[in-house]
Amino acid sequence: METFILSSDSDDDCPPPPKRRSIEGVPKSFDGDKKMRFSFDVTRDIILEDSEAPCSSNNIFTPSFRRDSNKTLLKTPVSLRRRSRSMNCMTPIVDTINEPPINQVCSAFVQKEIQLDDDDDDEKESSTEHADDDLNLRALLSPEKKKRKEKVDKRRPFGVEEVQNEFYGVYCLISRSERQCYKNRCYIGYTVDPNRRIMQHNGGRFKGGAKKTDSRGPWDMVCVVHGFPNHVAALRFEWAWQNPAVSKSLKEKQLKKERKETPFAYQLRIACELMNSEAFSRFALTFRWLNTKEELPFPISCTPPNHVKLRYGKVKKEMSLVPAKSADYVAMGECRLCGKDIEKLWGLVRCISQSCHSHFHSKCLAEHGLKNKNEYADQIYPLKSNCPICGHFYLWGDVVREQRRIIKVSTKCAEEFRNKVVRKDLPHREISSRLRLKK
């Protein structure tokens, strides 16, 4: 069997180099290949010695080479025939896709709904013509998202607006886990709704609970300190309660847990120290026991301040009604101390007594309270004082809380009542939590 042996780097006249490997089945000349990668899809015809194979456009991958007349062309091995051809001159065959016009992509369905034909025949013809287009357009148009239905409180009267009174509290939890390493541990947190927050902690992280309380419960919310003027003050109290060794208010006292002191008794002592500190002692705070079974006496060395209220039971949401009648609003009027008109609603405060209807400038009432307590040179606002008109005792924190409720109602009321003050004798609605028991 005759073979044609030639190196791909050699010329026709020159013999191949002595130490260069020759490849069987590789043609000698690449003149007709147009500098493309050689393909082994060769023909089986016998080519004369002096003739050259024509290179046509239809057969650009068929190599042209010269061979001896006495030699026959060797059949290309199967392993070499499987190699790919050059991709330089190959054009991909792509099926044409009938895409809809741009102006019909987003408006085809809209136009079909708007244009109403009078004749039934025209409607049938248009439906058959656009039947194929509709199938293609359905993949291009995104489905419409269903709007979530707004939750309506069934306990609220229909058509009556309400605003929730502000609540900022810092609570303490106790673990009831059966595992000894987690039992009786305490956790300090901040919340605006204690009834909802305790369910989140017992539900785990997927229900909104904290990382440190996940799979370490069940937890009991024992007590909560509330009455802060805003969320910033409450968060500062929470951080100081969690980090007594680093807090500016307590780091000088170096509070440490005693040997026979329980974890909750230690946390209660820290809370009492914070309520007596300079940063929080002038707030109208309330200490509430949520679980009376865990009630402990306050430490003798640091009892809460006298103005701090002590309460028992669960926290209830208070909702203030937004009245729609003009009879439920009163004019701002003039200040009962300076006699000048009150121009802005945010500068108005009033006595918290139900029988007194006096309005004051916030600056005037604060100066009056500071002068009575001889604190005008040291403080900005009084801790507690008496109304100059009726003599009713008040805490400044309660006065500010009432002012914020008035402003909150004014943002929800009608435009004609924006510069008026809502009456204080309107009823408030309390919402008690409904805990879902597991079956």
Swiss-Prot record:
The protein's enzyme class: hydrolase
SMART domains, alphabetized: GIYc
Compositionally biased spans, kind Basic and acidic residues: 125-136
Domain GIY-YIG: 166-253
Keywords from the named record: DNA damage, DNA recombination, DNA repair, Endonuclease, Hydrolase, Metal-binding, Nuclease, Nucleus, Zinc, Zinc-finger
Similarity-based family: Belongs to the SLX1 family.
Subunit structure: Forms a heterodimer with him-18/slx-4.
Protein name (database record): Structure-specific endonuclease subunit SLX1 homolog
Organism: Caenorhabditis briggsae
